[in-house]
Amino acid sequence: MTGRIALLSLTLFSPLSLASTPDGQALDFTHSTIGYAALLIFAIAYTLVMLEEYLQLRKSKPVLLAAGLIWAMIGYVYQQTGSTEVARQALEHNLLEYAELLLFLLVAMTYISAMEERRLFDALKAWMINRGFNFHTLFWITGWLAFFISPIADNLTTALLMCAVVMKVGGENPKFVSLACINIVIAANAGGAFSPFGDITTLMVWQAGHVSFLEFMDLFLPSLANYLVPALVMSLFVPHQTPSSIQEVVELKRGAKRIVVLFLFTILSAIGFHAFFHFPPVIGMMMGLAYLQFFGYFLRKTLARSLAKKTAIAMAKNDEAALKRIGSVVPFDVFRSISHAEWDTLLFFYGVVMCVGGLSLLGYLGLVSEILYTEWNPIWANVLVGLLSSVVDNIPVMFAVLSMQPEMSLGNWLLVTLTAGVGGSLLSIGSAAGVALMGAAHGKYTFLSHLKWTPVILLGYVVSIVLHLLLNHQSFT
């Protein structure tokens, strides 16, 4: 049993993720030199990923190299056994999985980048700053906004936006910054758990067809409880002070609100293709990219006329500041927004997909699946997945589960979606939002400051699981 637990830990603590093999005569290399070498390469690669902040080494680099080495070894051993076609089919299958993920995320990131370029998030930040809220009110406002924005935007962007407000208003109060950042991380992760667009893990579960778009809403109340339980406790310790008033003026660029509407239509297109035609949602997302491209064309073609009107108004009012802003206007370019996508993250996903493809073909994921989902009760296995995601990034953990293809009820698929999404809140290093805020609020929000509240966050984790088991018990049959 000890040996199996060790193998389980080693497997899940490396980026074993998103790959699965098609039907074919895959060979078992779990007890071979090649298999052990693959595990060692994964362990080293993931160690480097975890040390990204300290080494200043982008996380995509080690997993890209690991993927190449693993598949080179697989190619060699399958060539020796005369089964090259099996390995090639597995490789192509995983490349297709990655292509769907890449294009979907690229469109979503492009829209978020376009909203940032049109200053939509800057305007939201300025609105909160100008209201002169006290620390207690700001604690709740940033938390609620993080919870409700992250299902549409990604939780990382949401967390960074809310943290910018906290640092701008209360940066001189370390206690408030620490509590507010913890609250934001919990809220962003919890909010992302009940929407396919809120987190990469929920997106993958949706694309795999295990949970429909509307069925994700069954996780709303458990996710809400996951946020509210620790937030209510922490709010008792927030300083009851009012920071000095700051006035900040932000003018939205032309087309900002219409881009939000186009993004909503893009989401509806993705849902429609998946619901009505059973096509991959990425088809609707790519169609949505065309919406943005044509709108960008419209903005460029009408820019001169728009600037002429604004210039005439500014000259009539003798507004020098407005004239200066008009003179610095840069035409909207959708390809600039595409270039601002998080390419390190997208390449990291490639490494994760191919690494797990190799592990799956070598037989390790089948072995781990046997331990987790056959010998254990799936409910306890899914609770463990959430705890693992507090140490290991939830993306490789969830991709590993998807690659195992366990036979589970809808309730258990919802449970693993919930736990993988919110489990990362237990530690600051457990989610991209937490890691990013440690950098944005350096010295004020730290690993140790988050760790002090882990028992309260764990209480919220347990309450959310129990609430899901009670409210959605019919989906476990």
Swiss-Prot record:
GO biological process: sodium ion transport
Effect of residue 210 to A: Shifts the pH optimum to more acidic pH
Influence of pH: Optimum pH is 8.0. Totally inactive at pH 9.0.
GO molecular function terms attached to this record: antiporter activity
Periplasmic side of membrane: 1-33, 79-94, 151-154, 207-220, 278-281, 363-378, 439-454
Keywords recorded for this protein, A-Z: Antiport, Cell inner membrane, Cell membrane, Ion transport, Membrane, Sodium, Sodium transport, Transmembrane, Transmembrane helix, Transport
Effect of residue 93 to A: Shifts the pH optimum to more acidic pH
Recorded consequence of changing residue 157 to A: Decrease in activity
Residues annotated as transmembrane: 34-51, 61-78, 95-112, 133-150, 155-171, 182-206, 221-238, 259-277, 282-299, 345-362, 379-403, 414-438, 455-472
Cited InterPro entries: Cit_transptr-like_dom (IPR004680), NhaD-like (IPR045016)
Outcome reported for the amino acid change (mutating residue 150 to A): Lack of activity
Residues making up the signal peptide according to the UniProt record: none
Effect of residue 189 to A: Lack of activity
Subcellular location: Cell inner membrane
Example of a GO cellular component annotation carried by this entry: plasma membrane
UniProt membrane topology term: Multi-pass membrane protein
Effect seen on changing residue 393 to A: No change in activity. Shifts the pH optimum to more alkaline pH
Family recorded in the similarity comment: Belongs to the NhaD Na(+)/H(+) (TC 2.A.62) antiporter family.
Primary role: Na(+)/H(+) antiporter that extrudes sodium in exchange for external protons. Can also transport lithium.
NCBIfam families with a match to the protein in the record: NhaD_1
UniProt name for this protein: Na(+)/H(+) antiporter NhaD
Lineage, broadest ranks: Bacteria, Pseudomonadati, Pseudomonadota, Gammaproteobacteria, Vibrionales
